Amino acid sequence: MPATTGSVRRPKTTGLAKGDPAPGVAKVDPIVVIDDVTRRFGGLTAVDVDHLEIPRHAITALIGPNGAGKTTLFNLLCGFDKPNSGTWSFDGTQLSGIPSFKVARMGQVRTFQLTKALSLLTVLENMKLGATKQKGESLLRSIFPFIWRAQDDEIEEKAKELLVRFKLDAKADDYAASLSGGQRKLLEMARALMSDPTLVMLDEPMAGVNPALTQSLLDHILDLKDLGMTVLFVEHDMHMVRHIADWVVVMAEGRVVAEGPPDTVMNEQAVIDAYLGAHQDVDLGVVTGRVRGELDTAALTLLDDIKADEAEAIAAAEEENQ
C-alpha cells in the first residue's frame, strides 16, 4: 500500500529483506546491525534482542505495547545507555561503548518522546545548536569573531531554510517555550537535520501532537526518506504505521517477536498476542471462578497453565527457604 499524505501517494520501499519476513531476517543493505544485546534492570530484562537489522533508505517502525523495550533499545543504540551484553554497528562501525555525542557526529541522530528544546533560547538559536563542528565552540576561538563569523552565517542561513521547510519561520525569534507541543516536535525534527544525518531516530513523534499538525509531521517523515535518509521510529498508532512504514519490527517483553512489511506483520498472531494478550478470547472471570460460566478448551488450557505456574513458583520458594 502506498504511503498517502494529503493528495500525494508515495510508493513504499520493497525488497528490503533477503528471506521471508521473520525475526532476525537478514536485510539486503542494513545500516544498523544488532547482535545479542541485553539490558537488565535488577531482575527485569528490558531488552533481549538476538539479531536485528535495520534496512537502509527505508522507514522502519518499532512497535509494541508499553514496556516492550522500544525506548530502552533506542537509548542503547544512541549511546544514552549501556547494555549488559551484546554489540551493534552503524554503517559498518561498531558503536558499543561509544558516547552519545560521538554517535550523533557519525550521522545517527534522534529525537525524544518528551521534547528537549531549550525554552529560554529562541527557535532559531535552538536550531543553530544542532550544527556540528562549530568553530566558535572553542573558548579561545570564541573571543575572536573573525574566526567563526563566516561559518556562523552559513549555519544561520541553513537553520532559516529548515524553519521555512517546517513552517516555523514565523516563530524564529520567539522563545521555544512559546511553542505548542506539536511545534516542538517539528523543531526537534528540524534541528536534527542541522547535522546532515544518515539515520534519523524518532521516539513517538506523534505523542501529544494536535491532530492539525499530525499530517504535517507525517509528510516530514516521508520527506526524510525522499532526501536519502533512513528513518527508525517508535510509534503506537497502528493506522499511521501501516500507511507510512516500509518495514515494521514488533517487540514484546524485550524481544523481537515479528518483523516484515506492515500489512504482513499486522496479521501475525504474535503481534495480536503482543497487543491484546495471547488469551484475548478467554473470559478470565470464568477461568478464575469470579464469574459463572462454562470452561471451554481455551479456558481449560489457560487454567492448567496458571496452576502449573503457581506450582512452579511454590516449589521455587520452598527450595529457596530450605
Language-model regions: role of each:
Residues P2-E310, I314-N321:
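Glycine-rich phosphate-binding loops of nucleotide-dependent enzymes
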